[in-house]
Amino acid sequence: MSVDRPDCRFTVFGPPGAFVHVPNSSYRPIPRTRFFGRHMQWPARIRQMKPDAFFGPAGVLPLGDVGSPSVITVHDLAIYRNPRWFPGRQPLSTRYVVPRSVLRADVVIAVSEHTADDIVEIFGIPRSRIQVVPHGVSPSFSPMSGEDLAAARERLKLPSRFILFVGTVEPRKNLETLLDGWAMMRDRPDLVVVGAWGWLYEPIREKMARLGPGLHHIEGLDPADLPAVYNLARVLAHPAWYEGFGLPPLEAMACGTPVVVSERSSLPEVVDDAGLVVNAASPNDWRDTLERVIGDTDLAADLRHRGILRAAQFSWSRSARLTWRAIDRAVTG
């Protein structure tokens, strides 16, 4: 964002001891005391600075008045849709901080049309106060040459044929349905799961252990290696019950990898006609659709082509421009 507005000065607040490289900016630590410091002391400091606008990219405002027009970005509202997906109900946040932030912000950014609809339904604010700003995709996610891919496959010890899942291992991601569908596939490729253990994952881990050979779990993957993993996959499977946006399908499409997603939340919106959409709750549908993509080279080629074109419509520079539009709107009223 700072690149788009070189005439603007930024004050970035974050954890003590952290360093964020943002041009035209200064860095200041958020007070250490979690509640009183962040919601009372911090707003007082902001008011003293007299900023033209306050931007909360994590979806919340301090409870204290910041003394300027404000914009927040809401990434998803999964905990409101199904609290059982999470280890705790976070009552202070879900009942007070987040609702108050959404109601007070001059402009609320939603990362998808689906998230915008959720904001209206859950909090009752007018749709006119919401601006949709989709996520972007980094240029590093792109088709790679065969030589580079061969080296990456050997270095990362990836199988010759595999279906890919990218995401935290947690209930909301619905990995269990994918595991059931994959286990039923005929002549199935391997399944590579890239992502850390999240929460409430014990039943998922037990199922993964029972499936044995052919299932690979990669934790702590260097982010620089992720484009190569996408490129090497025969297909990305993203069966999530809920996403505010859904970056892995977009990243996979940018790499030219066919994508199969669930029909839930924002995922059909992100892939549009460039991916296949499957019933999130049906292992049989996942099996059948993945077998189609693996076995039909013409279909896979068409999905690769459509995916690259679809992903080209998303960029972080576009996201920055739209975010600035939201901030300008908040400032000018």
What are these regions (language model features)?
Residues M1-G333:
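Carbohydrate transferase catalytic cores enriched for Leloir-type hexosyltransferases
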